[in-house]
């Protein structure tokens, strides 16, 4: 089920929170309808604003709308004209006072919704879908908080007669793990031969006890020291042509030199040999 269900709904109340926060008894259906209308209004009027998320919170006589965007200048407009227009449209829709908060997204490459929008925009501009997917994966994996990403495109890819789905993945994306922090985004690209759906899953680590789990990183010096070859054990040509001394043989040669050096001045009986010794009965 982790492969099919929406990752946000699957982990709701465990690692993810609600995007609409309010309480209603008899007006529940009306509030849900208003929330859908608010999100649709913001998505259709601000396609190029890079809106990653919309959070709605209601009180008795006020509605607070938080817009997380990668381009706050487009949402605000010149001297705040665009923000005033959006606020007026929302007040007309809800018939209540609207508090509009515009928040900037610091790392748009690590937001699944923005990555999906970027891939869909490239597909609309006739960019090859494989190139767009790989470019999005490479830019996302450069972020320090991204541990895995999966990008999937579905539709008439490349203008083919039959629709199909293709995906690319890099890193870990554990969709069945509930404690995993999975960000999910979906967007549609409108092309001349139909619509292509773009889905993005981004894995940002595990959340244990309400805190993100930090994996210990080994120091670079220790890894470098482990990978370096011991001095004097470089593969060299010896014997017949085409034969090369292996790392095991070189290590044995160095071990024999060290044992001979430590036993200088002692009798030959104390020298350790690698030949098997048979105990006398």
Swiss-Prot record:
Molecular function GO terms recorded: mRNA binding; rRNA binding; structural constituent of ribosome
Spans through the membrane: none
InterPro entries given in the database record: KH_dom, KH_dom-like_a/b, KH_dom_type_2, KH_sf_prok-type, Ribosomal_S3_C_sf, Ribosomal_uS3_bac-typ, Ribosomal_uS3_C, Ribosomal_uS3_CS
Domain called KH type-2: residue spans: 38-106
One Pfam family hit: KH_2
Residues of the signal peptide: none
Keyword annotations of the record: Ribonucleoprotein, Ribosomal protein, RNA-binding, rRNA-binding
Region named Disordered: 218-281
Compositionally biased tracts (Low complexity): 238-256
A single GO cellular-component term on record: cytosolic small ribosomal subunit
Key word RNA-binding present: yes
Any GO BP: translation
CDD domains given in the database record: KH-II_30S_S3
Function, as annotated: Binds the lower part of the 30S subunit head. Binds mRNA in the 70S ribosome, positioning it for translation.
UniProt subunit comment: Part of the 30S ribosomal subunit. Forms a tight complex with proteins S10 and S14.
Family from the record: Belongs to the universal ribosomal protein uS3 family.
Protein name (record): Small ribosomal subunit protein uS3
Biological source species: Mycobacterium leprae (strain Br4923)
Gene that this polypeptide is encoded by: rpsC
């Amino acid at each position: 089920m982790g492969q099919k269900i929406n990752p946000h709904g699957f982990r709701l109340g465990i690692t993810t929170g609600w995007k609409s926060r309010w309480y209603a008894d008899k007006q529940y259906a009306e509030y849900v309808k208003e929330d859908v209308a608010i999100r649709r209004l913001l998505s259709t009027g601000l396609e190029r604003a890079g809106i990653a998320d919309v959070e709605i919170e209601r009180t008795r006589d006020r509605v607070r709308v938080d817009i997380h965007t990668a381009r706050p200048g487009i949402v605000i407009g010149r001297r705040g004209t665009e923000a005033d227009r959006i606020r007026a449209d929302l007040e007309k829709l809800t018939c209540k006072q609207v508090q509009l908060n515009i928040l900037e997204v610091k790392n748009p490459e690590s937001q699944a919704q923005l990555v999906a929008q970027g891939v869909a925009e490239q597909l609309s501009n006739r960019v090859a879908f494989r190139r767009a997917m790989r470019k999005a994966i490479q830019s996302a994996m450069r972020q320090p908080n991204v541990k895995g990403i999966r990008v999937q495109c579905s539709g008439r890819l490349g203008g083919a007669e039959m629709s199909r789905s293709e995906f690319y993945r890099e890193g870990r994306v554990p969709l069945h793990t509930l404690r995993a922090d999975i960000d999910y985004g979906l967007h549609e690209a409108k092309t001349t031969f139909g619509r292509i759906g773009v889905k993005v899953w981004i894995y940002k680590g595990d959340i244990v006890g309400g805190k993100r789990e930090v994996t210990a990183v080994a120091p670079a010096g220790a890894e470098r020291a482990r990978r370096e070859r011991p001095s004097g054990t470089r593969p060299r040509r010896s014997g017949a042509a085409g034969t090369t001394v292996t790392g095991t043989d070189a290590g044995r040669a160095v071990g024999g030199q060290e044992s001979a050096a430590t036993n200088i001045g002692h009798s030959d009986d104390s020298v350790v040999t690698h030949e098997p010794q048979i105990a006398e009965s």
